[in-house]
Curated annotation (Swiss-Prot):
Protein name: 2-keto-3-deoxygluconate permease
NCBIfam families: kdgT
Catalyses which reaction(s): 2-dehydro-3-deoxy-D-gluconate(in) + H(+)(in) = 2-dehydro-3-deoxy-D-gluconate(out) + H(+)(out)
Cell membrane in keyword set: yes
Main location: membrane
Compartment annotation: Cell inner membrane
One GO cellular component term noted in the UniProt record for this chain: plasma membrane
The gene coding this protein: kdgT
């Protein structure tokens, strides 16, 4: 049976299918982990330790050396995305109630959900899109996008926007596995190759554990809102990313659209933030559901929109070239 190939036909399938299976488990048998105990309970409830190992391996996979073009492109996209998420957080914190919207169509929406959905780019999706529609340097710009993975950037945004406060040691704790992995991976290429293989392997495991924190009734309640959140992520982050790519990154805007997605790792952010700041715990389940839906929506729409944009840009460039030749 070609199970893996079937799962990968779904956008973000290796993340979303185990997530859904975990949610099924939690919805219909919430006490399964405690009942079975031991290793089974560890797989069901081990979101944080599994993610800690994943962050370590992610750090180890990043190469310190990169060309100036790659760093400029990557830095432009990462900084722009984070800056937009910060602005959204600052505005949302003045409009949305402290504990999120609790009634009506927007029930479940919180500043935590907005920031988690907007501050991370799906690096793998970006790289695959730009390999088709961009240059090698543009495709390689995903190198710094890995720095967005994990709760650190979300913590910085929430902290600097005055929405939450984190002790310095909490910041260190959040980024330490990543930094240790990064150091080891760059000190020894063989270690980088060894640990980087686990990045993709661990995704289904932390996704399943994460799914076991989600009640499917919450997803049913936030489904349409999650779709709208996904569209909002593309519009709100995509426009500034296109502008930044043109003005600073030296591109034609294609990379900007390709970077306007939500990363699969963002689904874990609400739960991780809630572990550090208990005040966010009531919002975490709904925020996780919203972000998961946004990940699906952006994974489907971003490649389509990038393709349309790229064709129009190339057609315009060809037309200008023809006119220039005629003159």
């Amino acid at each position: 049976m070609q199970i893996k190939r079937l799962i990968e036909k779904i956008p973000g399938g290796m993340m979303l299918v185990p997530l859904f299976l975990g949610a099924l488990c939690h919805t219909f048998s919430p006490g399964a982990g405690k009942y079975f105990g031991s290793f089974t309970n560890g797989m069901i409830t081990g979101t944080v330790p599994i993610l800690a190992v994943w962050f370590f391996c992610m750090g180890a996979s990043i190469k310190l050396s990169a060309t100036g073009t790659v760093l400029r492109k990557s830095g432009t996209l990462v900084v722009t995305k984070i800056a937009v998420a910060w602005v959204v957080a600052a505005i949302a914190s003045r409009i949305i109630p402290e504990h999120g919207v609790e009634v009506g169509f927007f029930a479940g929406l919180s500043t935590l959900a907005l920031v988690a959905a907007m501050d991370m780019t799906n690096g793998g999706l970006y790289a695959s899109i730009m390999q088709q529609y961009g240059t090698k340097e543009e495709a390689g710009a995903f190198v710094l996008m890995s720095l967005e993975s994990g709760p650190l950037m979300t913590m910085i945004i929430l902290g600097t926007a005055g929405i939450a406060s984190f002790e310095p040691h909490v910041f260190v704790g959040a980024v330490l596995p990543f930094l240790v992995g990064f150091a080891l991976g760059n000190l020894d290429p063989e270690l980088r190759e060894f640990f980087s293989k686990a990045v993709q392997t661990l995704i289904p495991f932390f996704a399943f554990a994460l799914g076991n924190t989600i009640d499917l009734t919450v997803i049913a309640q936030t489904g349409l809102l999650g779709i709208l959140l996904g569209v909002a992520v593309i519009i709100v982050t995509g426009i500034p990313l296109i502008i930044a790519d043109k003005l600073i990154g030296g591109g034609d805007g294609t990379a900007g659209i390709a970077a306007s997605s939500s990363a699969g790792a963002a689904v874990a952010t609400p739960v991780l933030i809630a572990e550090m700041v208990p005040a966010f715990k009531p919002m975490a389940p709904a925020a996780t559901s919203l972000v998961a839906t946004a990940v699906i929506v952006t994974s489907i729409l971003v490649p389509i929109l990038t393709s349309i944009w790229s064709r129009k840009v190339k057609a315009r460039a060809a037309k200008i070239e023809i006119l220039g030749t005629v003159k």
